[in-house]
Amino acid sequence: MACLLRSFQRISAGVFFLALWGMVVGDKLLVVPQDGSHWLSMKDIVEVLSDRGHEIVVVVPEVNLLLKESKYYTRKIYPVPYDQEELKNRYQSFGNNHFAERSFLTAPQTEYRNNMIVIGLYFINCQSLLQDRDTLNFFKESKFDALFTDPALPCGVILAEYLGLPSVYLFRGFPCSLEHTFSRSPDPVSYIPRCYTKFSDHMTFSQRVANFLVNLLEPYLFYCLFSKYEELASAVLKRDVDIITLYQKVSVWLLRYDFVLEYPRPVMPNMVFIGGINCKKRKDLSQEFEAYINASGEHGIVVFSLGSMVSEIPEKKAMAIADALGKIPQTVLWRYTGTRPSNLANNTILVKWLPQNDLLGHPMTRAFITHAGSHGVYESICNGVPMVMMPLFGDQMDNAKRMETKGAGVTLNVLEMTSEDLENALKAVINDKSYKENIMRLSSLHKDRPVEPLDLAVFWVEFVMRHKGAPHLRPAAHDLTWYQYHSLDVIGFLLAVVLTVAFITFKCCAYGYRKCLGKKGRVKKAHKSKTH
């Protein structure tokens, strides 16, 4: 017995030291994030990887929004030619411009210019990073095992190529929905709606025509947004570079998708779905928020937030919203830092910040007023809370359309809606049981999975670090030209064969026909000469 006990102790100690050794010799990961809400899900993955013993270095511009110090990673800071005030002003302009009136004809141009306010800033960051020789030398000397990035803008993609590192993308979507084109996934326009169209996967003929035309315009939009990055990449890599080719070198795509929100579509084997990764177990609320909920009585609360980029609204619109909120019996917790509307009702409480997921997970929450950003939509799905959606930009319009199609919420045009529209929408999602039933059904489907999204994401990042990439998952479609991919050369060859055979057959028939006619003609002539 004592011998068995000693053996067990030795085995236990061995397992402990092996685990400890695995933690000590963890891999090195270089993280190139995108500031703002995109960082939130990436941060969760980074923290778990750090807890598992990996050494994490996060590349951070010295002026930023959310990329703060942490015990989980080391920040590598690089200088940028602007200050915190300019950063704040750009984001404020970006948010406020979405409430400006615009005509149908000028809307695309206005949206493009507004997006460039922020995208231009990210390009300055990328330029500053890739031209900082000291920082690049540090990366080379550090000998990282992989690079983890958000590829919505391609700075991390270029850096991975420069350092020769396998890469993992954490991704929601490009501004022009070309991620499936880059991954070579089948992407038929007949049933897969393009970004910003607000179409479902069951399109009318006219919608399919529009979808087809948008598909033709997407490469041009990509060129407009990314041509500067292509020039920058060529200068850094000292060769002519095609950005699309760089994107195609990714090892694994971690896509913040789930088919409870997305329309079904084919994907490639190196594309992993981790939609809902931001959903966490509800934590206890602070005394302040618990008091608000307790005071709401049987009617419960409504949570109202338009995301991290928008916390102020033009006065006239804010007053219209406040008027609608005052006409429902629920207590409304509104994340808002602008001027307090003069008509704000007693049931509406303004807060500078709110624990969104924890509030949505509370059983007294009746509805969620949201801009339909992917984080908020997934938190609403996870917690089973119906939505009133006021999309502002990016993928929010499409997210809202998807949830409305599934009967989980009501969509309003924030520029055109009236106080009465918002009031009616709130009363509908709160009082009509079908909205609650539909969102609970989606919640049940979403949470019925073998592996949690966060665990899945961590596994694949570690997989790429362990194996120095995932070439076995890379489809051969990347090695084909566009005409080979669509089998145009094969079609052309077979068409040429058919035409050649048809031509030869025609010539043979024509020759035979002429021969036969010629023979008959000679026979007739001979017959006539004999009769004479």
From Swiss-Prot:
Coiled coil regions, renumbered to chain: none
Catalytic activity line of the entry: glucuronate acceptor + UDP-alpha-D-glucuronate = acceptor beta-D-glucuronoside + UDP + H(+); (5Z,8Z,11Z,14Z)-eicosatetraenoate + UDP-alpha-D-glucuronate = O-[(5Z),(8Z),(11Z),(14Z)-eicosatetraenoyl]-beta-D-glucuronate + UDP; 15-hydroxy-(5Z,8Z,11Z,13E)-eicosatetraenoate + UDP-alpha-D-glucuronate = 15-O-(beta-D-glucuronosyl)-(5Z,8Z,11Z,14Z)-eicosatetraenoate + UDP + H(+); (E)-ferulate + UDP-alpha-D-glucuronate = (E)-4-O-(beta-D-glucuronosyl)-ferulate + UDP + H(+)
Transmembrane segments: 490-506
Keywords: Endoplasmic reticulum, Glycoprotein, Glycosyltransferase, Membrane, Microsome, Signal, Transferase, Transmembrane, Transmembrane helix
PROSITE patterns assigned: UDPGT
InterPro entries: UDP-glycosyltransferase, UDP_glucos_trans, UDP_glycos_trans_CS
Signal peptide interval: 1-26
The keyword Translocase is annotated on this UniProt entry: no
UniProt membrane topology term: Single-pass membrane protein
Tissue specificity comment: Expressed in skin. Isoforms 1 and 3 are expressed in kidney and liver. Isoform 1 but not isoform 2 is expressed in colon, esophagus and small intestine.
Compartments it resides in: Microsome; Endoplasmic reticulum membrane
Keyword field contains Transmembrane: yes
EC number(s) stated in the UniProt entry for this protein: 2.4.1.17
Positions annotated as glycosylated: N294, N346
Biological process per Gene Ontology, one example term: xenobiotic metabolic process
Any GO molecular function: protein heterodimerization activity
Gene Ontology CC terms: endoplasmic reticulum; endoplasmic reticulum membrane; intracellular membrane-bounded organelle
SUPFAM superfamilies the UniProt entry points to: UDP-Glycosyltransferase/glycogen phosphorylase
Other known facts: The gene is part of the UGT1A complex locus which displays alternative use of promoters, first exons and terminal exons. The locus is defined by 13 first exons, which are alternatively spliced to 3 other common exons and 2 alternative terminal exons 5. From the 27 possible mRNA isoforms, 9 produce functionally active polypeptides (UGT1A1, 1A3, 1A4, 1A5, 1A6, 1A7, 1A8, 1A9 and 1A10) called isoforms 1 (i1). Use of an alternative exon 5 (5b) as terminal exon is leading to 9 additional alternatively spliced products termed isoforms i2 and which lack transferase activity.
Similarity comment text for this entry: Belongs to the UDP-glycosyltransferase family.
Protein name, UniProt field: UDP-glucuronosyltransferase 1A6
Originating organism: Homo sapiens
Taxonomy of the source species: Eukaryota, Metazoa, Chordata, Craniata, Vertebrata
Encoding gene, per UniProt annotation: UGT1A6
